[in-house]
Amino acid sequence: MRVAAATTLALALLGVVSEAQTIRVQWDRKVDFSGYRSFTWIEGTAAVDPEVNQILTEAIENELSVRGIFPDEAEPNLYVVYHASAREEFQVEGGYRTDWADSGAVTVASHLAGTLVVDLVDAGENRIVWRATATATVSGNRKKARGRIPSVVQKMFADFPPSAPGPP
């Protein structure tokens, strides 16, 4: 039960994040993103918590719509997909000591690391043209964690769309 609750908390994704939060964005530098005006969703790896999935979907749709890219299932330019995951990580400290009178205690600490990957896939070519990855240590209660999701997504899309490609 503890693991299930912890996993749900971690998948409340990047919730109350520590300073260890990292956002990485990659894109095809040959692509002109100004032509993308519509998208539809394709299935990815959903969070365990349905409410988290709804928050993620709304946050991503909001970031795209403020940039002039709107949902259109009939004729999308882009497919949007996200992958949410969490894993427990361990940190081991201590160990051998030079003083043989002391056993050299070992301390093991664990924390949850959450990852969110958002891919934008060119619908015509069926290939990823933009990817943002956010990773962070997740802590705090579920309500606070859920409340932080939109700001994490906003940071992921901060520089979207990328600048138009230069001359060859």
Placement of each model-derived feature along the sequence:
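Bacterial N-terminal signal peptides
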Residues: 4-15
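Surface-exposed short loop/turn segments
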Residues: 23, 67, 76-129, 135, ...
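A structural "domain/chain start" motif
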Residues: 17-67, 75-76, 82, 165-168
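Solvent-exposed, acidic/flexible segments
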Residues: 34, 49-57, 109-114, 138, ...
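C-terminal partner/receptor-binding element of secreted or periplasmic proteins
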Residues: 136-168
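Residue-level detector of anion-binding/catalytic polar loops
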Residues: 70
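Residues at beta-strand starts and edge strands
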Residues: 4-5, 37, 76, 114
